[in-house]
Swiss-Prot record:
Protein name: Capsid protein
Sequence segments annotated as region (P domain, projecting): 210-345
InterPro entries in the record: Capsid_prot_S-dom_vir, Viral_coat
Compartments (UniProt record): Virion
Keywords assigned: Capsid protein, RNA-binding, T=3 icosahedral capsid protein, Virion
Species, as recorded: Carnation ringspot virus (isolate Lommel)
Amino acid sequence: MTSRQSRKSKMALVPKQRQNLARTVKTVKIPYATTQIVTTSNPPKKGQIKVSGRQLFMSLITSSSFVVNNGLPTPSLLSLNPSNQYLFPSLAYEAANYDLYRFAKLRLSYVHDTNATVSGRVSLMWDRDSQDVPPNSRVSIPQCTKSVSTAVYESCAIDLPIDDVWRFVRDTDVVDRKLSDYGQIFTAVHSGSTTDEVGDVYLDYTIELKDRQPTASMVQTAYWDVSGVLAKSEGPRYFSPSSDVTFTSTMAAISLQLSGIFNVQVVVTCTTAGTLVVGPNISVIGAMYSQFTTPRYFAQPVLACTGVPNGTPSVSMTGFAGITRITLVITRLPPETRCRNRQFP
């Protein structure tokens, strides 16, 4: 018998059951923890939107002297950013949902509503730097990036140059605004013989918004202390913390330059509470709630502001003593608040 035949005969002696068991043995894999990589894209580029509009933002009042922006005390109030509540009161709420913007069209126009018997001149200007100081004389008008001038009884317009740069929608006060703003615009009147309203200024715009984000706050919160160490403002700019608010240890004054209806909450840390009164460009809707519990005075009025500046502050607090800190919380309300909510709060 050969060796090959010998091996075959030995395999034949192995029981069939044993052979089947050998064939059914399986390899068991030990499980390991696995992870997943999650990527997001919010939103895709095709998700950007385009908005067009025409906004009346100022009615010019002629003057014999050189007056810029109707005498508005706030610097850079007319900066071109969709978050600017003064220039874009409706667009600002839409822009609060996006990170980036770019203008596709900008046209600044003056429409007269007076006749040729009224003297004076009107100038419209655009400056590429939103932090430049306003012009202070007629000589400064041609020094702006672009300008146009005419008699108060002639309409005029200026098309602003457009670039293709995406900028950030400003959702709070920033140190260097020129990085987010597309310059600023100015209006000026001079050489008039009266102080009458002579015409309206409009801004026509087409803007693109992209990169949706959680809605930015539409409530401005600002606070200061008398020593000046603590001063901060967050949210949209209904007023300028640096120029629209003045206060000492015994008084405080606030100037509102925006036309609209606002819910204002004032908290004053003090030793003695005084009175809160409103100026000529403000009317109180309903009853004003106020309370003083040492060491804090609290007031919550609903104010309707005309937006027309004058020498008197919009809100004045007098007769106080020992003021150390002031907190303001301002929210813009819809126009129908005037009719439906006269008893607020």
